[in-house]
Amino acid sequence: MAEIWFLVVPILILCLLLVRVIVSKKKKNSRGKLPPGSMGWPYLGETLQLYSQNPNVFFTSKQKRYGEIFKTRILGYPCVMLASPEAARFVLVTHAHMFKPTYPRSKEKLIGPSALFFHQGDYHSHIRKLVQSSFYPETIRKLIPDIEHIALSSLQSWANMPIVSTYQEMKKFAFDVGILAIFGHLESSYKEILKHNYNIVDKGYNSFPMSLPGTSYHKALMARKQLKTIVSEIICERREKRALQTDFLGHLLNFKNEKGRVLTQEQIADNIIGVLFAAQDTTASCLTWILKYLHDDQKLLEAVKAEQKAIYEENSREKKPLTWRQTRNMPLTHKVIVESLRMASIISFTFREAVVDVEYKGYLIPKGWKVMPLFRNIHHNPKYFSNPEVFDPSRFEVNPKPNTFMPFGSGVHACPGNELAKLQILIFLHHLVSNFRWEVKGGEKGIQYSPFPIPQNGLPATFRRHSL
């Protein structure tokens, strides 16, 4: 009997191993194949190719070679790039539960781990609703007089400068509007110290993440601690006053979940800093591009001036403030904004990470791989926008095809503050074309990334008063 078992056991083990190999092979085959593309050098992948040229050229050349879904390796991470509206919707909307937002740890430290865009699930849903309720039309329409004041103050200061770095000054404007929307009327001392420390964090955000004393990143980490301290002081003051506020901070302080739990000071601080980051650079970049596009097309600029002049005269040459109705009745100016968003594609792509193995159109997206919907490739695809390299606001007289225009992202992680962004841009442009002329200086053309695309050197220009 022992001799029989001596022969049977090895045969059984061999059979089990064969079954396991066959099942594993079938499972592997059923998982689909990886998308076409090149993974480049070990670890580095194609990082050098991406950063040594215009990233839009890199992605466009890849799409021409491999199609609308392709693989690569960037900064050590295997990635799948998606350049079709259907694929973007798949990742961001219909199958969003299979993908999670992903950011480098170094950037998460500077913004704060509790910030809205690092999360999914109930916490993300709660915070997103708070952001949306803070920036509903019913809320932001009350900010119009204050945004007007900020816009006019900014423009008047520019008229006294020999040369204006348009992008840098637009960042200051967007920051001041962000502070207004978050805190309401904040004491100037708090505003200045917030601005000082925020600027240090902003400079270190895209620096090499080396936390050694003296480096930009280390300075940014120290300034981030200061920001948390300042925001905590403001929170304590607000709680002592027990005043019901409808600004973003007020919504955060008044929040309770279904279990009666409130947000911690750290969660509040992280989300305030996160909203500031989201509000500043993208709005500033968009405004800078609009000024360039209008400057380069004087006929279009005159048409925008004519539209704004009607409102200017209706308000007795600015003796009356803008109204919400008037900001909703600027059709040409609005089309200029959305065409600028398409043309510049300030949010060129977004990052997600597959949380499970995902199959899309016969291709495998393995668990743990980064996934990047390429918004700019979609916005500049002639299948969806004719003559995509031509700036033409009239194209938006007809609504674009579904999922082909995503300037603020899409799905549950789309920008919840886009209405505030559009409102402040409309207000700024009204006062700009009604009261000023500007002239772009320097002959440099092209795009630089900081990290968002902006005109070369931030569009240096002069601004002079000139009423309609």
From Swiss-Prot:
Membrane-protein topology: Single-pass membrane protein
Recorded catalytic activity of this chain's protein: 2-cis-(+)-abscisate + reduced [NADPH--hemoprotein reductase] + O2 = (+)-8'-hydroxyabscisate + oxidized [NADPH--hemoprotein reductase] + H2O + H(+)
InterPro entries hit by this protein: Cyt_P450, Cyt_P450_CS, Cyt_P450_E_grp-I, Cyt_P450_sf
Name of the top EC class for this enzyme: oxidoreductase
Binding site for heme: C415
GO biological process terms held by the UniProt record: abscisic acid catabolic process
Keyword Oxidoreductase attached: yes
Major localization class: membrane
Superkingdom of source: Eukaryota
Name of the protein in question: Abscisic acid 8'-hydroxylase 4
Source species of the chain: Arabidopsis thaliana
Encoding gene (name): CYP707A4
